């Protein structure tokens, strides 16, 4: 079983406004951030944070997709296992995904709409986050 949590969220703010909050040091983009040269524009961010209750670092990967007047954000958090027999992370991946989205919404001062939320996300459930 994969311990990952996925969110698909519409942030009611322009793409520029959303990517402006992705700065070095933010827990949702402190590993990697890139805006691709595509139309519509797409950005990728990777963050890492230590969770005491999981006893491990977790990562969050985000895909940001430009829309006309809003930005779609896919947040996938995972990595709370310490060994082969760990079958739970005490909700850490869920909390990291939600915390990352909540921070983006607060920093942009935008309203956000959760379109989908997927617990125990794995490749067989990835269709649920497709747009």
Regions from the PLM with identified roles:
Residues 129-131:
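Glycine-rich, aromatic-bearing surface loops/beta-hairpins
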Residues 15, 36-38, 64-71:
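A short, structured loop/turn motif at beta-sheet edges
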